[in-house]
Each structure stands twice: as C-alpha cells, then as structure tokens.
C-alpha cells in the first residue's frame, strides 16, 4: 500500500517534529519584523551584519547595472564571467592557496566536492556531528563512509590504522560545528592526516570571516592553514551574501572543475552575488572588519557566560554559536514560541538536525546586536527556562 503523505505529516506533528516556514520582514539585521511585531533576531548566521552593509549593496547594484541579473549558463558552457574569475582569485589570496572555486551553496559544494575526490575503493572519515551536506556528499561518493565520535582523535586514529592502504583516504570535518558552536581540533587532525597519508577537508562555513586574527577562519586561528588540503566555506553567513567556495591547490581545483557534478551541471552564481562577495572580503580585511570581529567575540562571550550563570548547558560552545540545551522537542518548541511572544526570535532545533534528546535553542550572535538586547534575552530565557523546568 502506498504510504500516505497526509499520514506522514500527521506523524511528524505528533512527534513534535513538524516544521513550517515563518516569514520575516525587513533586512537580516539584529531586529526583524515577525508575525507583525519587531523582534530581536537571535538565529541568523549574518554574524558581522554585512547582509545589509552599504558597501555590499552598492557593489551588487553596480554589478547588475553593468553585467545584468544572471550568468546565463553553467560555468563550463558560457557562464564563467570575469566576476567569477576575479572572486576566485580574491578568495585564493584571502585563504593563501593556489586557487579557489565558487559553488552555488554550501550544500552544493560539499555534495559535489566529496564525490569528486573519493569513490568506490576509497574511504571517507567524517565527524559524527558534521553538517548534513557533508553526510550526503559522503553517501553520494559511494566510498566507504566511516563516522568517528565527535572530536575523538583516538577513535579516528584507530579507524585510520584499520583502513590504511584501502585507497584514497579523506578526512572531513566542520571547522566550527554549526549546532554546538565548538571547534574541531585542527592541529591533531593535521597530524593524523600526515601520519596516515590522508587528505584533509575542513568545512569552515561558520568560521570564515569570524575566526583568526584577520578573519581567515578556524585554520588561521590554529595556524594550520598551509596543512589543510581543502578549505571550504560559505559566502552567505559572515560574508553576508550567498554561495560557497573551496580553496585548495590548483590541481585539486582543476579536478573539481572536471568532476564535481554540482558545479558542472548548475547555472553559475549571478553578478550581484559575486560582486557583493568581493566587497565583503575587502571589508573583512579592513579596520572596520577587525572591529566587527572583536565586537562579535565580546558579545558571544558575554552572552554565553550569562546563559551559563542562569543555569543553561551551552554544550561546549566556543564561538558565536551558543546553544542552550533543552532536551526534548515539545519543550524546545514551547520555549521558542514563548520567546517570540517576549520579543526574541530564537529557533528551536530538533531531530534529525540534532540527536534525539539534545533539542536546543540555537542562539547566534551578530556584531550588530545591542548589549542591552542580549541582556534582556538572557533574562527572558532564564525566566521561561525556570517556568518550563529546564533550569
């Protein structure tokens, strides 16, 4: 019998796992209008506030006036514009690599890069808390897919030793884990990839523009950028735009151009997006960018400390992603609704995004948040958390 779609939707509702879209009005600043009222936005990845920055908007408008609204084709047909080449050259300089390649999204990047690098007879090692796009890329590759416990380097070493000689070996990790806000131990991963002759790929979607002295990401923070084979990141979080990139050797980029299906078979990014990304990189390199990173780091530390003092488990967060552990799905979503009523938009996170029993409020900080708004948010969370028996 054909499985009922209506029945499947009802089951999601009964399990507290049903999802729906909420429309917000205005730009992605620290405040938006949701359900007819202005609220403080605490779940955006617009970490530096660049999505509404005048420099990015001006660059996008000028690009549209000169180049039009679309690229017209995939990159290997006629869709490689001078803006693509200019952005990729800028990204390579930004990351200190020989070359870079842009993709249409972080999901498209990971689901295209990994199958281009490994296949049948090869092995890919993935942290158990890696992003879904990495998981799907590993599955699509048809390589042997080995998941190691989160940040457990002893377990990873045992698995590498077990599979030594099994073909090409690829280690893939998030740089900043998107649901916990903690960091991958990159120096230890570099040591293991050297010892076992593996490739190392780091998805730095949530570190690009934020971490490191000059905003180059988690690899810069740990001073291991030169030892990472592929540095992937996005243009749509701290950089305020849309799309993704990978920075690597010229040889690796050449292989991806020829093998990454999500790159080959997609119409390329449009002019406005490309120009805005270049403007964002310039801003990250400026004194203003440095000031924004410092303000973000300060706000994140104050917010995290205040939540911990209020009794919340912030799950080892070290970055601008600050989760507050709730536990089960129903109280997490009740918490979300109550906070919205109080004027704070925080999204509850449920399975399959996170493991069962670890539902949470995923709070994300922006450099443009007012400290007073963050203080009020913590007070509201503490009050509601006590009412729900969470703290």
Swiss-Prot record:
Annotated Pfam families: Aminotran_1_2
Pathway this chain belongs to: Cofactor biosynthesis; biotin biosynthesis
Domain of life, source organism: Bacteria
Enzyme Commission number(s): 2.3.1.47
Gene3D superfamilies documented for this protein: Aspartate Aminotransferase, domain 1, Type I PLP-dependent aspartate aminotransferase-like (Major domain)
Reaction(s) catalysed by this chain's protein: 6-carboxyhexanoyl-[ACP] + L-alanine + H(+) = (8S)-8-amino-7-oxononanoate + holo-[ACP] + CO2
Residues annotated for substrate binding in this entry: 19, 131, 353
PROSITE patterns cross-referenced by the UniProt entry: AA_TRANSFER_CLASS_2
Ligand binding (pyridoxal 5'-phosphate): 106-107, 178, 206, 234
Function: Catalyzes the decarboxylative condensation of pimeloyl-[acyl-carrier protein] and L-alanine to produce 8-amino-7-oxononanoate (AON), [acyl-carrier protein], and carbon dioxide.
Name of the protein this chain belongs to: 8-amino-7-oxononanoate synthase
Organism: Geobacter sulfurreducens (strain ATCC 51573 / DSM 12127 / PCA)
